[in-house]
UniProtKB/Swiss-Prot annotation:
A lipid is attached at residue 20 (S-diacylglycerol cysteine). The lineage of its organism: Bacteria, Pseudomonadati, Pseudomonadota, Gammaproteobacteria, Enterobacterales. It is a lipid-anchor; Peptidoglycan-anchor. Its main location: membrane. Keywords: Cell outer membrane, Lipoprotein, Membrane, Palmitate, Peptidoglycan-anchor, Signal. One of its GO terms (cellular component) is cell outer membrane. This is Uncharacterized lipoprotein YqhH. It is found in: Cell outer membrane. Residues 1-19 form the signal peptide. A lipid is attached at residue 20 (N-palmitoyl cysteine). Pfam families: LPP. InterPro entries: Lipoprotein_leucine-zipper_dom (IPR006817), MOM_Lpp (IPR016367). PROSITE patterns: PROKAR_LIPOPROTEIN.
């Protein structure tokens, strides 16, 4: 009995759902998917092209931070010497 009910429910659901979607809507959604895939591909190319610039900027920022940290360290040493004298 459960099997017959399950099969009947599946057949009924299939019949009902097949009438809910028209071909125009499916084609529009397929077109939207293609457009989005093209945009994703362009963005991936842009990211790949920018990656070397990002690494260069990070490297320069790290060098600048290292110089500033060293400068702060020596400034602190000078201050300590002044107060120690």
């Amino acid at each position: 009995m459960k099997t017959i009910f399950t099969v009947g429910a599946v057949v009924l659901a299939t019949c009902l759902l097949s009438g809910c979607v028209n071909e125009q809507k499916v084609n529009q959604l397929a077109s939207n998917v293609q457009t989005l895939n093209a945009k994703i591909a362009r963005l991936e190319q842009d990211m790949k092209a920018l990656r070397p610039q990002i690494y260069a900027a990070k490297s320069e920022a790290n060098r600048a931070n290292t110089r500033l940290d060293a400068q702060d360290y020596f400034d602190c040493l000078r201050c300590l010497r002044m107060y120690a004298e």
